[in-house]
Structure formats: structure tokens, C-alpha cells
Curated annotation (Swiss-Prot):
Domain YcgL: 3-87
Superkingdom field: Bacteria
SUPFAM superfamilies: YcgL-like
HAMAP family cross-referenced by the UniProt entry: UPF0745
Pfam families per record: YcgL
Organism of derivation: Pseudomonas fluorescens (strain ATCC BAA-477 / NRRL B-23932 / Pf-5)
The protein's name: YcgL domain-containing protein PFL_1496
Amino acid sequence: MKRICSIYKSPRKNEMYLYVLKSEALERVPENLLLAFGKPQHAFDLVLSPERKLSREDIHQVLENLDKQGYHLQMPPAEDEYIEHLPEELLRRNDPV
């Protein structure tokens, strides 16, 4: 089952995305979610199928959410996934001896 999907990014939260069926646009997205998400900014369109790999989402869950509720919300990664960790020697460089 292939789906043509539009993906929108949130202006309020970095790396938060909303997947919707292109044919339905934002029709089935709850109003309170849209208020929290901010004005959706179209990022791109994508053909989704069970064989397709997504970098941070389970394709089967995305397709199921699109079918059942009309949208899929991709949350930003946990903070520790994108914070660059510095080596211990750099963290202690300015410590008093």
C-alpha cells in the first residue's frame, strides 16, 4: 500500500514534523494539535510504502497512523541524541588546579 504524504515542519519546535496524506492535507489533524504545532510549513512530499526506510520513524507505525487518524506526528529527538558531547579534557581545561 503506497501513500503520497505531505510533510510539514513546525515553526515552534525544531525537528518536529507532521505527516499527512497529500489528498487530505490537514483536514483530519485535530485543531488543538495544530495550535500547539504552529502554522505548518510545507517541507516536502514523499511516497511512502512498507518497504521504504525512514531515518527516525518506523514506517509501519507512520502508515498505520495515517490510515487510522489521518496524520503522524514526529517528535524531536531526545536532547542527548543531538547534543555533542565534549571530551573530558576539554570540559576540565579551565578548572582551577
